Every structure is written in C-alpha cells, then in structure tokens.
Amino acid sequence: MEMTNAQRLILSNQYKMMTMLDPDNAERYRRLQTIVERGFGLQMRELDREFGELKEETCRTVIDIMEMYHALHVSWTNLKDAQTIDERRVTFLGFDVATESRYLSYVRFMVNTEGRYTHFDAGTHGFNSQTPMWEKYQRMLSVWHSCPRQYHLSSNEIQQIINA
C-alpha cells in the first residue's frame, strides 16, 4: 500500500485515537500505528488486506451461495426421507481463512453485522471451512440455478447439488 507521509500521519493519529476509544484492542492499534509511522513495507501489506475491496459482483455471488445453502437446508427439512442425506452436507461451511479471507470476512459481516442468515451455524471456527471452497460453490451454484424449483428441491436435486 503506497501512502504519502501526510496520509501515514493521519492514519497513525486514527490508530492512536482508536487505542484510547477501544482499550480492549489497544495493543493491536498500537502495533498498526507503529507499522504506519515507520512505513514497514512488509507489514504495510497487512493494511492492504484490511482495506481490501470486494467487488459488487463478488458480494452478490457470496450472497447467492448463502441463499443456495438456505434453500438446500429448507428443502432438506421438508423431505420425507431426509435421513438419506446427512444434514452436515446441506450446512454452509463458509470459506478458507488462509486463501479466501475476503469472502469469509464478507460472510461474517452479513451474519454478524447485517443480521442475515443468522440461522447458519458458524461452528467453532466462525465459518472458516479450513479448505478452499470457492470453486466447489461455483459448481454447486451452476447445478442449483438449473433446478426449476430452487426452494423446493427433491432429494435427487439436493444430491446433485452437493455432489457437484
């Protein structure tokens, strides 16, 4: 992240204020303040991640993935023979924190801040699937979108989606 000295000074002052306003996270803000003040290039890359951008199209895709899992779970609940499909297969896992952190951050924002999909179980890892999921979800979405009744899926349709 390239910043002028003036921008670094402004951000440093913001971190200093946050240290006073949020004592529980003061150590984190002091660390970031030091990084910005001294311009440590390697650590400045952390700010790129914090101030990253998620395009509107990507946000819509993440919401679509979450909506697909909502539809899968609702459909699974309505099945007469739901035992044939393990509930864990229709439960949203989230995204990999190591490789898909921007998507994971958006999911957490949608659930914890926006109050959407609050019925999803974050598990002990807070929607960290611990394995890359983006490509899998893309295949699943393709199958789900081809289903005529996306919220009234049959057992066979659910199987096709989760096995995509």
Swiss-Prot record:
Protein name: UPF0304 protein Ent638_2838
Signal peptide: none
Domain of life, source organism: Bacteria
InterPro entries listed in its UniProt record: UPF0304_YfbU, YfbU_alpha-helical_sf, YfbU_helix-hairpin_sf
Similarity annotation: Belongs to the UPF0304 family.
Disulfide pattern: none
Pfam family, one: YfbU
Gene3D superfamilies for the chain: Helix hairpin bin, yfbu gene product, domain 2
